[in-house]
UniProtKB/Swiss-Prot annotation:
Organism for this UniProt entry: Mycobacterium tuberculosis (strain ATCC 25618 / H37Rv)
Subunit note: Interacts with toxin RelE, which neutralizes its toxicity. Also interacts with toxins RelG and RelK in vitro, in M.smegmatis coexpression with non-cognate toxins neutralizes the toxicity of RelG while increasing the toxicity of RelK.
Keywords for this protein: DNA-binding, Repressor, Toxin-antitoxin system, Transcription, Transcription regulation
Additional remarks: Was identified as a high-confidence drug target.
Protein name: Antitoxin RelB
Gene Ontology MF term list: DNA-binding transcription factor activity; sequence-specific DNA binding; toxin sequestering activity
């Protein structure tokens, strides 16, 4: 993650926007040497907002933990198995 002074961002905003769109890295913008803002791509913001919405859903965190435990224990059906079940009909 890059840390860039506000004055530099002001002068090269278009370049920094292109950089975060391409790399999906965050840029911390400082004012008087202290973090003041963070520049991220619109796609990354949408992803963060979607994740927060899921985590706000009652029971979602527990369901995710249970699902990960099931996968780790081998309790899952692969895409190929599902495809074979439905194409065999």
């Amino acid at each position: 993650m890059a840390v860039v002074p506000l004055g530099e961002v002001r002068n090269r905003l278009s370049e920094y926007v292109a950089e975060v769109e391409l790399t999906h890295e965050r840029i911390t913008i400082t004012r008087h040497g202290h973090p003041a803002a963070v520049l991220i791509s619109a796609d990354d913001l949408a992803s963060i907002e979607e994740t927060l919405e899921v985590l706000r859903t009652p029971g979602a965190s527990e369901a995710i933990r249970e699902g990960l435990a099931d996968v780790a224990a081998g309790r899952f059906v692969s895409n190929d198995e599902i495809r074979n079940r439905y194409t065999a009909r």
